[in-house]
Amino acid sequence: MNPGVSEQITRKSASNLALAFILLPPEKRVAMSALYAFCRQVDDAADEDSIPVDERRRTLAAWRTDIAAACEGREPSMEVNRELAPHIHTYRLPFALFDELILGVETDLVQTRYNTPSELELYCYRVASVVGLLSIEIFGYTDPACRAYADALGKALQLTNILRDVGNDSLRGRIYLPLSDLERFRVRPEEILRREWSERFHQLALEVDGRARGFYRRAREILPVSERASMVSADLMGNVYWRLLERLGRSRFHVLDETPQRLSRARKIGIILGAILRSRLGLRVTSYGGD
């Protein structure tokens, strides 16, 4: 077994999640790298549009079976899962959460529209909050309020992703913005698929932005003071995505271009360094969810 496969996957990625690992102790960093590699592989398996849907469904079923084996103490066959297995047992990561994550990415095989905000929220829970719920087990915590914190922050991050990626998703025929919102603001799906920005679209995006901000505020408010140190990596993620959401807002949500807006690496590093400094000074790392 090559113990570096998960690390290689993590290093290849430009993910904000991978950047947040820098604040973790070495043993937790290794565990998070393995968890991230699993999430990345499963997501990629669902997203490869050049592969027939039935084949992708079989691939995800194989991932589900293999991670179940790891959770049950049996030897998994996939290398990423073999690297993740010891951390599953060290941190008691439950199969139910891995299963929810796979359910979420399986949704992308068959569903390209979401009727209501509640329907979209369930999707966000499965593909993002669940990752947070697994991550906090690795971070370590004692106050169960951390689970509600991870749930809210995950939804905030995913809604930010959805707003950033509207244009890119439209190229694949996907519209994650709820159809009930489109109807309310008189935005036709065809306008999004043609990547036509309008003031009506701007108002629609502001509505979703408001929901995302609500989840950021909830995460900020619910995190116990006693758990701020343990959740510092999660808070760093929140800071990065909050800055991205603010950037999208300043652009009046001109997010229909093929290339999504992103924070520069220098900007991200600045956010990380600021978080490290505040953490070492005993100050609150959180900078998201404020007015």
Language model segments and positions:
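Catalytic cores of Mg2+-dependent Asp-rich isoprenoid enzymes
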Residues: M1-Q158, L163, G167-D291
